[in-house]
């Protein structure tokens, strides 16, 4: 059989700037500038040629060091979990759970699962995805992805509490530490504090603050790594932006 003439063969792959544009990174023209400026890597190598073609199914593409997700079957969502709702996709006892909420708002929820949990009486940011590798790494303590909370505690918080929490407090299941602590606001009998830590043990923020002498009255998770709750309303769901996904990948070494 005669070989197909070289000039008639279709070039393999898709132009890199088109791939970046389809991934929502930038317009095609802006993506071209990113490539020329040396901000784009393909499979570990900086690419500056605009004619470069890639196979989105196998190529690992990064912009400014952050990985670009090219698989359009992958879903990444941010949920503001309301207080009183359980962090499960279904509940045998008929209690309200995030699965009920997601089912009403997002199609194809059977393939989605939640990254970690929040107590029923805690509200705030949760991530949902069908990207198993990313979810596994985000939940694994070795990657130490920071999480930030706003906690309303009983009492007036002294200046030295942050130093105490950074040094660590011994709990029943071992010592616990915070990465950052700040007083946000105070009213008679209550204080609003911001706590950042990378631990994921059960009710860790509540137990840590209670052990320090300041029981938590209300708790909201506001940040997971580069993803912030912002002005997202309780019960609302949004798709993560490309840069947020890329920074999560970067945080866990993908």
From Swiss-Prot:
PROSITE patterns: PSI_RSU (PS01149), S4 (PS50889). The active site is at 119 (nucleophile). CDD domains: PseudoU_synth_RsuA_like, S4. Keywords: Isomerase, RNA-binding. One of its GO terms (biological process) is enzyme-directed rRNA pseudouridine synthesis. Signal peptide: none annotated. Residues 14-81 form the S4 RNA-binding domain. It holds the Pfam family S4. Coiled coil: none annotated. It catalyses: a uridine in RNA = a pseudouridine in RNA. Its EC number is 5.4.99.-. One of its GO terms (molecular function) is RNA binding. InterPro entries: PsdUridine_s_RsuA/RluB/E/F_cat (IPR042092), PsdUridine_synth_cat_dom_sf (IPR020103), PsdUridine_synth_RsuA/RluA (IPR006145), PsdUridine_synth_RsuA/RluB/E/F (IPR000748), PsdUridine_synth_RsuA/RluB_CS (IPR018496), RsuA_PseudoU_synthase (IPR050343), S4_RNA-bd (IPR002942), S4_RNA-bd_sf (IPR036986). Belongs to the pseudouridine synthase RsuA family. PANTHER family: PSEUDOURIDINE SYNTHASE FAMILY PROTEIN-RELATED, RNA-BINDING S4 DOMAIN-CONTAINING PROTEIN. Was identified as a high-confidence drug target. This is Uncharacterized RNA pseudouridine synthase Rv1711. It comes from Mycobacterium tuberculosis (strain ATCC 25618 / H37Rv).
């Amino acid at each position: 059989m005669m070989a197909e003439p070289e000039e008639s063969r279709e070039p393999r792959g898709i132009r890199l700037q088109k791939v970046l544009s389809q991934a929502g990174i930038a317009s095609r023209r802006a993506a071209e500038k990113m490539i020329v400026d040396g901000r784009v890597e393909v499979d570990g190598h900086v690419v500056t040629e605009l004619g470069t073609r890639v196979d989105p199914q196998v190529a690992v593409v990064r912009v400014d060091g952050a990985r670009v997700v090219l698989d359009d079957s992958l879903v990444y969502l941010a949920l503001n979990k309301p207080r009183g709702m359980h962090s499960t996709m279904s509940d045998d006892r008929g209690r309200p759970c995030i699965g009920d909420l997601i089912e009403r708002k997002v199609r194809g929820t059977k393939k989605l699962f939640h990254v970690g949990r929040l107590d029923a009486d805690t509200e705030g940011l949760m991530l949902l995805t069908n990207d198993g590798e990313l979810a596994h790494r985000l939940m694994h303590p070795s990657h130490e992805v920071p999480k930030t909370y706003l906690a309303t505690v009983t009492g007036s918080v002294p200046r030295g509490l942050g130093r105490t929490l950074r040094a660590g407090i011994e709990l029943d299941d071992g010592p616990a530490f915070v990465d950052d602590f700040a007083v946000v606001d105070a009213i008679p009998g209550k204080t609003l504090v911001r706590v950042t830590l990378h631990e994921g043990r059960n009710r860790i923020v509540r137990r840590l603050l209670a052990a320090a002498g300041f029981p938590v009255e209300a708790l909201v998770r506001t940040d997971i790594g580069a993803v912030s709750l912002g002005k997202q309303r309780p019960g609302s769901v949004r798709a993560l932006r490309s840069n947020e996904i890329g920074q999560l990948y970067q945080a866990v070494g993908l």
